[in-house]
């Protein structure tokens, strides 16, 4: 007998706009939170115990917000808007004020990437004013670190991911470009380490597993492309996953490295086993494009959630494959 189709354990409504980005903060503190940011310039901070918005922060002059995250320093929120600004917010003691901002000069949809380098210090990478350039600065000082521009014509930078390898002196950055190329950059040396042509179309999204040195990317086509880094930091293309319908907005790997989720333009979330890319579930709830997916960072694995945000202005939350089920 086949399993019944999964249904959300609950949904969050009232965001008032397409949900471009989601970020969980469930690891520390008393209250598990989910941050969502909309195409109308609002950040909702959802209390997952009450399932209601604890706070709504209006920012970026009503422009679409395309990325939110929290910094390790307590109560600091970081957001990126289509107004070409990255804002740092103080949310401590009930505040909701912008304490600093960074002008990016980019009107594109490339989401920022942030990496903690030491307690209270981060690197922030973002698409720059020129279509192919990536700028990296230190936070909180805003000191410029480098600007990364490819030698070849690869078009606009579409997506980026900073990470710190276990071995090696400094951070690396993965970037997907308009011509379908992936590039690996050495931030310290400001140099390109390797490249691979992963897609015939622009790379819409990518995610990376630093423990396994393995990543996956999506585009407007029906294919997910997986790839890995060898010991010489060369990008090696691996298996492809063929989708039923074209178009992926976002990809996310669960913290334990067992699951991969994709946000589909076909209104569906697809869940795969990350090890072998085995299809596990198709989550159907939304009535428009799914724009964002995120796994929660609960310490207790049984509480882990998958959230999906859609153009239909709703967030769905799912509890799947939490009890040691075979994920392939």
For the regions a language model picked out, list residue spans one by one.
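WD40/WD-repeat beta-propeller blade N-cap
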Residues: 12-19, 58-65, 102-109, 149-157, ...
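A short helix->beta-strand "capping" segment at the edge of beta-propeller domains
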Residues: 1-17, 50
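A structural motif specific to WD40 beta-propellers
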Residues: 7-9, 52-55, 97-100, 145-146, ...
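Loop/turn segments within WD40 beta-propeller blades
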Residues: 22-31, 68-74, 113-121, 160-170, ...
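Conserved strand-to-loop turn within each blade of WD40 beta-propeller repeats
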Residues: 37-40, 80-83, 127-131, 176-179, ...
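WD40-repeat beta-propellers
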Residues: 43-47, 86-91, 134-138, 182-186, ...
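Blade-level signature of beta-propeller repeat domains, shared across WD40, Kelch, NHL, RCC1
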Residues: 291-328
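Beta-strand-rich domains and repeat architectures in extracellular enzymes and scaffolds
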Residues: 11-41
